[in-house]
Design a protein with these regions (language model features):
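Nucleotide/phosphate-binding sheet-loop regions of phosphoryl- and nucleotidyl-transfer enzymes
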Residues: 1-288
Length: 288
């Protein structure tokens, strides 16, 4: 039995990671120590589980050993400067918000009003790959910040947010990695827009993810344990002002049980399905 132990000085939690020669439906759920009877009970309520993973996120050092690229170094240096000196300039905020959040000027204006530096750092911390998190994810986070600042009484009753974001660059990396970039470009032409969409859809469904992305998927699955996961689209167009894009792309529910290999396969298939749904007729007609 291999497990992690966490405490916030009020409650004690264990989170099983590996178990040998035994099985139960709740085995990989986080458990809370019940002092009154000396037992550990699995966390099942959404509120309790969200609180637990907020604690894990605060205690876990995510600065793993890795070769940082220029963007990662920029974020790391920016965060260090802010922590030590309290400096977070408008120019730096412009770079981060344009790169990670949105290019919509109205959204960017709201971000400057409601987002704090730590909000940007938390988004970065929860990203798989790089690029933009898309309109739906950005809008959801912004809505929470508006409620937090303008209606703190209501915000106090909201569950902690607990999502990961697949950066827009991963979409293009997936295309290049699976060698159908040329098909992707030809599909964008007037002649190939509808004609090549079914072929491109199949390419999305049959591709594989780069190993670096798969490793980040595994880390995310380790973090969530065997909690159900919903993979949702959040394209650059979705939920922008005047461009709702509602219901055009797929959302996929992952049961997220079984071995790590089974859970990883389920997650990868869900992401493939969402990517492929960009080629459905309804979405194509909406984007014209």
């Amino acid at each position: 039995l291999l497990l992690d132990v966490y405490t916030d000085n009020e409650s004690l939690y264990i989170n099983p990671l590996k178990v040998w020669n035994r099985y139960s439906p709740n085995m990989f759920l986080p458990h809370k120590y019940m002092e009154e009877n000396g037992s550990f009970l699995p966390l099942k309520g959404g509120y309790e589980i969200s609180r637990f993973y907020t604690l894990v996120d605060a205690l876990t050092n995510t600065s793993e050993n890795q070769n940082l690229d220029s963007w990662e170094r920029f974020i790391t240096d920016t965060r260090r400067t802010y922590r030590r000196e309290g400096i977070f300039t408008p120019a730096v905020e412009d770079i981060i918000s344009h790169t990670m959040m949105s290019n919509d000027e109205k959204i960017l204006s709201l971000l400057k009003t409601y987002f704090e530096p730590d909000d940007y750092f938390l988004v970065y911390k929860r990203m798989i790959g790089t690029g933009c998190i898309g309109g739906k994810a950005c809008g959801m986070l912004l809505a929470r910040k508006i409620i937090q600042k303008d209606n703190p009484e209501a915000f106090a009753h909201m569950e902690p947010h607990d999502s990961y974001y697949l950066g827009s660059d991963v979409f293009y990396t997936y295309i290049v990695h699976n060698k159908f970039w040329r098909l992707h470009i030809h599909q964008k032409t007037k002649q190939g827009y509808f004609k090549l969409a079914p072929q491109l859809e199949q390419a999305f469904l049959s591709g594989s993810f780069p190993e670096a992305i798969r490793l980040q998927f595994i880390r995310m699955l380790e973090y969530f344990g065997q909690r159900p996961i919903i993979v949702r689209s959040s394209s650059l167009q979705e939920d922008a002002f005047g461009n709702a894009f509602a219901g055009k792309y797929e959302s996929v529910f992952c049961i997220n049980t079984g071995t790590m290999d089974e859970r990883l396969t389920e997650l990868e298939n869900a992401v493939r399905t969402v990517y492929a749904s960009t080629m459905n007729t309804s979405a194509l007609e909406y984007r014209r």
